[in-house]
Design a protein with these regions (language model features):
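Phosphate-rich cofactor/ligand-interacting catalytic cores and adjacent structured alpha/beta frameworks
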Residues: 5-8, 69
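Short, basic, helix/turn surface patches
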Residues: 7-16, 83-87
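Small-molecule pocket liners
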Residues: 11-17, 106-111
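Bilobed "Venus flytrap"/periplasmic-binding protein-like clamshell domains
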Residues: 12-70, 75-78, 179-182
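Pocket-lining segment of extracytoplasmic ligand-binding domains
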Residues: 58-149
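An extracytoplasmic/periplasmic, membrane-proximal ligand-sensing/linker region
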Residues: 79, 146-184
């Protein structure tokens, strides 16, 4: 659907490796069952570091994952919430690691439609989504409302959610993001 995606600008805060030891001392890592991109990114990182821990697919619950493994990968709201609740267990931000290594943004997802989808409707949807996102960025009262709702839903402070939306993720793909996507 063109220029729409989920892009980290370095530190992403929502794709995190947790554990009570650094990654190079993890014998096994629990992977969530809800993200192929993040699992692939962690495998890339481990390969870059010459690490080969055993990787196990488990449900995305930090406590149960860490009862069974030295490390646990969490994404999305669960990662944001767990980082707030257990800051000492955060060992690695994968968005930051990708950008540090490649110098490029990390694209965690793109908005796509099946080839059989009506092209006119897809153009209309893309136009509307881009306009809404740009309005969110420009209109402070609208952003504050979204931030308040998201913070309440996830259980974080509005300041933390505002930082996440403005500094850590973007929903627009630019040339650099597309290059990062191609590299990945």
């Amino acid at each position: 659907v063109g220029e729409l995606g989920i892009v980290s600008l370095g530190h992403v805060g929502s794709v995190l490796l947790f554990g009570d030891r650094p990654p190079d001392h993890m014998r096994d890592i629990a992977f969530p069952t809800d993200s192929s991109t993040s699992k692939r990114l962690l495998r890339w990182y481990l390969g870059e570091q010459g690490l080969d821990p055993r990787c196990i697919d488990l449900g995305p619950d930090l406590k149960s994952m860490l009862q069974q493994c030295d490390g646990a990968l969490l994404i999305g709201d669960r990662a944001l919430r767990a980082a707030s609740e257990y800051p000492s267990l955060v060992q690695l931000d994968l968005g930051a690691e990708w950008t540090r290594t490649t110098g490029l943004p990390m694209v965690f997802g793109i908005f796509a439609a099946h080839r059989s989808a009506d092209e006119e409707l897809m153009v209309e949807a893309r136009t509307e989504l881009v306009a809404n996102y740009r309005s969110f960025l420009r209109d402070q009262s609208r952003r504050e409302e979204v931030v308040r709702l998201a913070a309440g839903k996830i259980g974080l402070t509005p300041d933390r959610m505002d930082q996440y939306f403005l500094s850590e993720v973007s929903n627009l793909l630019d040339e650099e993001s597309v290059e990062g996507l191609s590299r990945f």
